Curated annotation (Swiss-Prot):
<keyword id="KW-0878">Amphibian defense peptide</keyword>
<feature type="region of interest" description="Disordered">
    <location>
        <begin position="27"/>
        <end position="46"/>
    </location>
</feature>
<dbReference type="GO" id="GO:0005576">
    <property type="term" value="C:extracellular region"/>
</dbReference>
<keyword id="KW-0929">Antimicrobial</keyword>
<keyword id="KW-0964">Secreted</keyword>
<feature type="compositionally biased region" description="Acidic residues">
    <location>
        <begin position="30"/>
        <end position="44"/>
    </location>
</feature>
<feature type="signal peptide">
    <location>
        <begin position="1"/>
        <end position="22"/>
    </location>
</feature>
<keyword id="KW-0044">Antibiotic</keyword>
<feature type="propeptide">
    <location>
        <begin position="23"/>
        <end position="49"/>
    </location>
</feature>
<dbReference type="Pfam" id="PF03032">
    <property type="entry name" value="FSAP_sig_propep"/>
</dbReference>
<comment type="similarity">
    <text>Belongs to the frog skin active peptide (FSAP) family. Dermaseptin subfamily.</text>
</comment>
<keyword id="KW-0732">Signal</keyword>
<dbReference type="InterPro" id="IPR016322">
    <property type="entry name" value="FSAP"/>
</dbReference>
<comment type="function">
    <text>Has antibacterial activity.</text>
</comment>
<protein>
    <recommendedName>
        <fullName>Raniseptin-9</fullName>
    </recommendedName>
</protein>
<dbReference type="InterPro" id="IPR004275">
    <property type="entry name" value="Frog_antimicrobial_propeptide"/>
</dbReference>
<dbReference type="GO" id="GO:0042742">
    <property type="term" value="P:defense response to bacterium"/>
</dbReference>
């Protein structure tokens, strides 16, 4: 009977240990997924910022081009 109790205790102990290991791995996996989602959100924000910056540079380039054309026409065709 004592042998049976020890065996049962050992089985329960090993079951609890394996269960706690599985829960720990699950938590680690959830944390990794959360970090990946945060990284994706950051990259989406960075992409939006870059697009906005490129749009501003594009419009600035258009303005500078128009000014350069106006200056060139002024010097080439003085009135």
């Amino acid at each position: 009977m004592a042998f049976l109790k020890k065996s049962l205790f050992l089985v329960l102990f090993l079951g609890i240990v394996s269960l706690s290991i599985c829960e720990e791995e699950k938590r680690e996996g959830e944390e990794e997924e959360k970090q990946e989602e945060e990284n994706e959100e950051l990259s989406e924000e960075e992409l939006r910022e870059r697009r906005a910056l490129l749009d501003k540079l594009k419009s600035l380039g258009k303005v500078v081009g128009k000014v350069a054309i106006g200056v060139a026409q002024h010097y080439l065709n003085p009135q």
